[in-house]
Curated annotation (Swiss-Prot):
GO terms for biological process: methylation; protein-containing complex assembly; regulation of autophagy. Methylates the carboxyl group of the C-terminal leucine residue of protein phosphatase 2A catalytic subunits to form alpha-leucine ester residues. Its EC number is 2.1.1.233. Transmembrane segments: none annotated. This is Leucine carboxyl methyltransferase 1. Pfam families: LCM. Disulfide bonds: none annotated. It comes from Eremothecium gossypii (strain ATCC 10895 / CBS 109.51 / FGSC 9923 / NRRL Y-1056) (Yeast). GO terms for molecular function: protein C-terminal leucine carboxyl O-methyltransferase activity.
Length: 325
């Protein structure tokens, strides 16, 4: 099960690269609000190095760039933009004097843009040991990526911290083991700094008890912070079969389990898992209210979207939540 969950990281990377290749990303919001520079170049560089290290993984990413349907590219667009905008709001609110803790980071590359823009920002990525070791290999073989995160070929490596830079750390940890994770965070982060935690398609893969312990202990560790969480929800209506079909397909074709998909199957139930009041939107709501008409018109020129109703169904079963304490 661990390995199949780890492989979902390359699904996410493939989706981002497909959206970049087709022109969905970077969006106007990422450029104008987040101030992202070199977004496409960073991702292309990462994939070029990945190609040298693993042609199998690179081929998987490249295949998605030509085969993903428009509805999937729309989904990648709103997922990426919504998380980026909320993350930037928090970091910018403290003038960059904050820290980001990305739990279940995978191949996410936001740190490359944010660390370059905010010289006082600290950024911590956490994921399975196998995942972060590959990420370290890719980062360390690129002079440009190393420059952006402030690392070098002499950056130290420890058993639990595979990349130890002045403002960026890449940690190996199992999110199901809350005690060990807290020890990692105590060692490598500052509990007094304003902290924003990211879980992007992470909580849905954890057993209920592990997910709730993670939320409780991490919120309790940092004196003040915000949590940005993106996940699928099963759907709360009796006639809604989206979640059950999704579970069945993932179980049959990917050997993946989503333990809490049908338990926290609505916005209300999902937000209730967090101790503080939360703002939560489905991705369809976000698309309708937060994406400008200019951006929507641009999206329509990229690929022909045959079924808007299909897009609405898909985006209505994913949420972004933001909570603060």
């Amino acid at each position: 099960m661990d390995r199949t969950v780890q492989q979902t990281d390359y699904d996410a990377l493939s989706c981002r690269m497909a959206a970049i290749t087709r022109g969905y990303l970077p969006s106007q919001k990422q450029i104008e609000q987040c101030g992202y520079e070199g977004y496409t170049e960073v991702h292309v560089e990462y994939c070029n190095v990945l190609r040298r290290l693993s042609r199998r993984l690179y081929s998987r990413v490249q295949k998605a760039c030509t085969t993903l349907l428009p509805v999937m590219n729309y989904g990648s667009f709103v997922r990426t933009v919504s998380v980026d905008v909320e993350l930037h709001k928090y970091v910018a609110g403290f003038g960059g004097r904050a820290q980001v803790v990305n739990l279940g980071c995978g191949s996410d590359l936001r740190m490359c843009m944010l660390l370059e823009r905010y010289p006082e920002l600290h950024y911590v990525d956490v994921d399975f040991a196998e995942t972060v070791k590959m990420k370290r290999e890719v980062l360390m073989q690129s002079a440009e990526l190393c420059r952006r995160i402030g690392a070098s070929s002499t950056s130290p490596q420890e058993q639990d911290c595979v990349l130890h830079g002045p403002r960026y750390r890449l940690l190996a940890g199992d999110l199901r083991d809350t005690g060990a994770l807290l020890e990692l965070l105590q060692k490598h982060t500052d509990a007094d700094l304003p902290t924003v935690v990211i879980t992007e398609c992470v909580l849905c893969y954890l057993p209920r008890e592990a997910a709730q312990a993670l939320i409780r202990e991490v919120c309790g560790f940092y004196k003040s912070g915000s949590w940005i969480s993106y996940d699928p929800i099963g759907g709360g209506q009796r006639e809604d079969r989206f979640g059950s079909i999704m579970q069945s397909n993932l179980r049959e074709f990917r050997q993946l389990e989503l333990p809490t998909l049908m338990e926290f199957n609505s916005k209300e139930k999902y937000s209730a898992r967090f101790p503080a009041p939360s703002n939560i939107q489905t991705m369809w709501e976000y698309y309708m209210t937060d994406i400008s008409e200019d951006e929507k018109r641009k999206l329509k020129t990229l690929q022909f979207l045959d079924e808007v109703e299909e897009l609405e169904i898909l985006l209505s079963h994913y949420v972004i939540l933001v909570t603060s304490w």
